[in-house]
Amino acid sequence: MQRHTKPYENVLALIGWTPLIRLNKVTRGIRTPVYGKAEFFNPGGSIKDRIGGPIIDQAEREGRLKPGGTIVEGTSGNTGVGLAIAAALKGYKCIFTMPDKMSQEKVRLLKAFGAEVIITPTAVPADHPDNYVMMARRIAHETPNAVLANQFYNDANPQAHYETTGPEIWEQTEGRVTHFVYAAGTGGTITGVGRYLKEKNPRVQIIAGDPVGSILAEMWRTKGEGKPEGAPYKVEGIGQDKVPGTLDMGIVDDFMTVSDKESFAMARRLTREEGLFVGGSTGLIVHVALHVARRVDDPNALVVAALPDTGERYLSKLYNDEWMRENQLLEADRTTLASLLGVKSRDGGEMPVIVSVAPGASVRQALRLMSLHDVSQLPVMDGANCIGSVSDWSLSAKSLADGKLLDASVGQIMDAPFPIVDVDQSVDSVAKLLSKSNPAVLVRSNGSLEGIVTRSDMLTYMMAR
């Protein structure tokens, strides 16, 4: 735990050295360890806090920003907050342009810092005068004593990550990081971190995620020769309809596209299973990170995904079931067995993922095991295979009828094995399997059995929703 043993001169000193947290529940069945760098621990709640101060410092050094001046920027919200924090300390005004798809939480947050916020249409080409970046350029040009932060073409952006985020990851992993996963918006983070990590170890792989509808992944695949047409998407703060100057495509080893639905589903899982309250872009990044970890399948590898911002900025969107359904991003019940198992494990203390009994164990041992773990049924496992099942009711009834059976082997009197279902199957569909003859189901992830769900687990879930 970080200890703040000395006072700080101001809030800017708290930016950086965010914690690296292992993902445990969403990685169930994956051998490769995956860690998230929790950038929402920055004072402004996002990774963009890292670039606000350096951009302003650069403008001051170059003489472009003078006392009482105005900082102008086109932002999806987070860079605006990073700039607004530094501007508040230095006495500058801020004017921000934002596309209309951004959450109201972000708009209100920027206004809370005293910034003027101008909303622009999302569905316009990158070179259209009403595009949020183009409008910011015009406002900066027309406003006396104003500078454009210009995060999409400002070298201070990737340099900040080269000097801070990259070294932090290297030190926190003791140089063991093998894969870094992020998503390009301006490209500053993935470029700066990627350059630093590859300088330390050229074998480190830099993997980028991209929303379906952004052109960046296709531009990378075609080495800039393609002319893809962008399309609207809901994930905020990442993806582009043109390649930013701060994105070094050559640093990226692979680009993967992810849908809004996949991104938001993963963000909600991270909140409910890992206790990490994150935004939609984090969901996209972790979705890619898990894909990479499965593909690598090496417990000695180490995947680091930066988690850009807090979920507090999306309460009206991805954490609003009504908004999700209106945008066809949420089914009637999106809860999967992975979520249910995560809650069960968190509430269940030290109980193993699957409490089982071997076929050669005695009935007496099976009953003691059920009593010890406060369960009423057990799968009978022969190695990694479920070959049968027993229940306290069945064993008790048979033992009362014939006391000698207490010392008989479980394999002699076991019942049929429990059904096996996949971890991504919906809770509602599995509920139908938990009939009188099926008191439990075993849950499979990536080919191996990872958990058990009983009728009691299902009833607890149904009563809570």
Named regions from a protein language model:
Residues 35, 257, 356, 389, ...:
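Short aromatic/basic micro-patch
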Residues 355-374, 380-382, 399, 419-438, ...:
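The conserved cystathionine-beta-synthase
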Residues 87, 110, 169, 275, ...:
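Terminal peptide-recognition signature
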Residues 376, 388-395, 450-458:
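Short hydrophobic beta-strand motif reused across regulatory alpha/beta modules
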Residues 1-344:
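PLP-dependent amino-acid enzyme catalytic core
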Residues 251, 334-354, 407-418:
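Bateman (tandem CBS) regulatory domains
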